[in-house]
Regions:
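Hydrophobic, well-ordered beta-alpha structural blocks that scaffold small-molecule cofactor pockets
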Residues: 1-117
C-alpha cells in the first residue's frame, strides 16, 4: 500500500519538474491500467499534452476522467518528456518510441526498480 503512494509521488515530481521547465510532457499508450494510474495521481489534460497511441480505435478520443486527448504515436517527436503508462511493456515502448530520441521518461516499472535500490 505504501509503495503506490511512493509511485504517485515520483510521477507527480516528474511532471512538476518538466512543467516548471516549461517542457511538454506526454503519456505513452492509452491502456486501462495507465488511465487508472493517471486518475489515482490526479493527472489530467493540464499536466499531459496528450497520450501517444498506435491503436486506431483509441486515437482521436479522450482518457476517461482526466480528459487527455489520445493521438497517433507518430507525433512523439514534438514532445520533451514522457510517462510510459502500461508498466508491463515499458521496455518495449521505450525502445520503440523514446530510446533513439533520448527523450527523458518515467514509468511505474522504472520507479519500482529505483525504490528497490
Amino acid at each position: 500500500e505504501k509503495k503506490i503512494f511512493l509511485i504517485k509521488s515520483e510521477i507527480l515530481k516528474f511532471i512538476k519538474k518538466y512543467k516548471n521547465e516549461k517542457k511538454t510532457i506526454v503519456g505513452i499508450a492509452a491502456a486501462t491500467k495507465g488511465n487508472t494510474l493517471l486518475n489515482f495521481c490526479g493527472v489530467n489534460y493540464k499536466d499531459l499534452k496528450c497520450i501517444i497511441e498506435s491503436s486506431p480505435y483509441k486515437i482521436h478520443k479522450f482518457t476517461p476522467g482526466s480528459a487527455i486527448p489520445i493521438v497517433n504515436e507518430k507525433n512523439i517527436k514534438k514532445y520533451d518528456a514522457a510517462i510510459i503508462l502500461p508498466w508491463n511493456i515499458t521496455k518495449h515502448l521505450y525502445r520503440k518510441l523514446l530510446q533513439k530520441r533520448k527523450i527523458p521518461y518515467t514509468s511505474v516499472d522504472k520507479i519500482v526498480r529505483k525504490l528497490k535500490k
